[in-house]
Amino acid sequence: MKYIINNFNLFDLQAKLKNFLSKNYKNKYYKRIKQKIFSYINLCNDYYNGNFLLKDLIKKYFKNKFSTFYYWANKILIAYKSNDFAELLLKSTIPNNINYQYSNDVRQNICDLYFKYCNKHAGGVLSLFYNLKKGIHGEELKNKAPKNLKTFFRWLKKDERWLKIKNKIKEIKKQHSRYEVKEIGLLQMDAKYFVPSKFSVDKKYYVYDFIDEKTRLALGYVYDKLSTDNAIDAVKKAISDFKNIFGIIITRIRTDNGSEFINNYRNNQKISVKKTNFTQFLTDKNILHQTTPVRSPQSNGKIERFHQNYTKLFVFEEKILNAVSLQNKLNDYYYFYNFERVHKSLNFQTPFNFLNSLSLIK
């Protein structure tokens, strides 16, 4: 066997290893080295004394870590052949160039380079870090720059200019006005999953929710699965309920790119979207169907935020065992959400009161 020492040399190896351990008992990693050495010696003894398979012995003495066994067996055999067991001593893994060993001048030069770089090239931390590693900004900075991205980023964050940029971004965000639509009847639609791990239900349910972007009025309908037919059925109910309860005529519905809303046919050349039964149904009802950009849930932000409120506001103790019971619970929640809960975005009015105030203005 390649990794098992010859039976005739086993006792000689054992004696030399014991002598090596006795000389290095003060070593920081003595216990760890001793454990690996004795595991290898005991494995070799059992291999020659009994009818054991090597893989069974590795499981027994090296806890099924084959790579650890091969690593130590190779080190021990090489040390025995060269008669130099010093290589068995473990060395510290602490890096030689830790962050505080870099000079302040190098740190300042790299920070200066970043703030010039981000203004000229509109680049970020990552692009400059890799450009430094490639030597684009000179061999001197390449050799002196930190090898770790976290260290590089920490330098920049502690610079005063970084704080000014962050404060400027915060001011811009504060000045940014909230996105609002001017018309009633523009709805966002999405599916919410109700799973037993988060809600007191007996199985997984799906709820198609609708929210009016202008008034924040919301309704939803429970189903056992996601499908185009269920999505169309939910829209039928929404058209009827929004008209009969709130007097709202739906003119547009925005959805994500779920398979129940659109069909994507992908190949190596192009992506084409085929009009589905869902889109055709909305067209027949004179309702515009919009879809959000791919991987852009913020485009349907109001319905996404509405779904986050479920975990905070939709609470019940008794376990729900069917879709009808869940729908009844949700109807109570929708009544609270539409008629009782005030919204900061609506000047601390309920969605229904805000709808009435709009009708009075007209």
Swiss-Prot record:
| The keyword Glycoprotein appears for this protein | no
Under the heading Pfam families, the entry gives:
rve (PF00665)
Q: Write out the similarity annotation.
A: Belongs to the plectrovirus integrase ORF3 family.
Kindly give the PANTHER family that the UniProt entry links to this protein.
TRANSPOSASE, PUTATIVE-RELATED, TRANSPOSON TY4-P GAG-POL POLYPROTEIN
Keyword list, A-Z: DNA integration, DNA recombination, Endonuclease, Hydrolase, Magnesium, Metal-binding, Nuclease
- This chain's protein is named Putative integrase ORF3
Positions of the Integrase catalytic domain: 179-359
Q: Does the keyword ATP-binding apply?
A: no
What is the role of this chain? This protein may encode an integrase, which is necessary for integration of the viral DNA into host genome.
**Which residues of the sequence carry a binding annotation for Mg(2+)?**
D190, D256
**Gene Ontology biological-process entries:** DNA integration; DNA recombination
InterPro entries in the record? Integrase_cat-core, Retrotran_Ty1/copia-like, RNaseH-like_sf, RNaseH_sf
Question: What organism is this sequence from?
Answer: Spiroplasma virus SpV1-C74
Q: Which domain of life is it from?
A: Viruses
What molecular function does GO assign, one term? Answer: nucleic acid binding
